[in-house]
C-alpha cells in the first residue's frame, strides 16, 4: 500500500459498514477533533457523537460522511479501525426516520425537564444529539 494511503474500517454490532482506503480522516474524539493522516503515531481514543469525514484517494474532490454515535477509534500503522455503537453512511440515512427521532427526543426532553428527572433529561439529550447528527450527515448528499 502507498505511504500516502490508509485503510478505514467502521464496525458496529450490525457488522462492517465501511471499509475503504483514505488519505485523510477527521473525527471528533472525547478530547476534541483530530485529523488523521497515513502512518500517524498509534492512538486509541473514545469517539463522540459526530460525523466522520473521509477523503478517499480515488477522488480528491469527494468526501464520504459517516454519522458515528460514540465508540472507539484505533490508529495503528496504515489501519484506522472504528468500533462504534452505531454508524451510518450519509447515503444510508433515512431522513424521515431521523426527523421523527428528533421530534420524539425533543418531546421527551420537554417532559423530562418539566418533571425534573435528570436521568431522563440526559437520555433525551443524547437521543436528540444522535438525531441531529444523523440529519446533519444526511445533508451531505
Curated annotation (Swiss-Prot):
Query: Has the keyword Ion transport been applied to this entry?
Result: yes
Q: Which Pfam families match?
A: ATP-synt_DE (PF00401), ATP-synt_DE_N (PF02823)
Q: In which compartments does the protein localize?
A: Cell membrane
Q: How does it sit in the membrane?
A: Peripheral membrane protein
Superkingdom of source: Bacteria
User: What sections of the sequence does the record tag as coiled-coil?
Assistant: none
Q: Which GO terms describe its molecular function?
A: ATP binding; proton-transporting ATP synthase activity, rotational mechanism
GO terms for cellular component: plasma membrane; proton-transporting ATP synthase complex
Give the record's keywords alphabetically. ATP synthesis, Cell membrane, CF(1), Hydrogen ion transport, Ion transport, Membrane, Transport
Q: Which family does it belong to?
A: Belongs to the ATPase epsilon chain family.
The role this protein plays is: Produces ATP from ADP in the presence of a proton gradient across the membrane.
What is annotated about its quaternary structure and interactions?
F-type ATPases have 2 components, CF(1) - the catalytic core - and CF(0) - the membrane proton channel. CF(1) has five subunits: alpha(3), beta(3), gamma(1), delta(1), epsilon(1). CF(0) has three main subunits: a, b and c.
Tell me what this protein is called.
Answer: ATP synthase epsilon chain
| Species of origin | Lactococcus lactis subsp. lactis (strain IL1403) (Streptococcus lactis)
Amino acid at each position: 500500500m502507498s505511504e500516502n494511503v490508509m485503510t478505514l474500517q467502521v464496525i458496529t454490532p450490525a457488522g462492517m459498514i465501511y471499509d475503504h482506503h483514505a488519505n485523510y480522516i477527521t473525527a471528533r474524539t472525547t478530547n476534541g477533533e483530530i485529523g488523521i493522516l497515513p502512518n500517524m503515531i498509534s492512538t486509541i481514543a473514545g469517539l463522540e457523537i459526530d460525523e466522520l469525514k473521509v477523503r478517499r484517494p480515488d477522488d480528491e474532490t469527494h468526501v464520504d460522511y459517516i454519522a458515528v454515535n460514540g465508540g472507539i477509534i484505533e490508529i495503528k500503522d496504515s489501519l484506522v479501525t472504528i468500533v462504534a455503537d452505531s454508524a451510518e453512511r450519509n447515503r444510508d440515512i433515512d431522513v424521515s426516520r431521523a426527523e421523527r427521532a428528533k421530534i420524539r427526543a425533543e418531546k421527551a426532553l420537554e417532559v423530562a425537564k418539566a418533571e425534573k428527572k435528570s436521568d431522563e433529561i440526559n437520555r433525551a439529550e443524547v437521543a436528540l444529539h444522535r438525531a441531529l447528527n444523523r440529519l446533519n450527515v444526511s445533508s451531505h448528499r
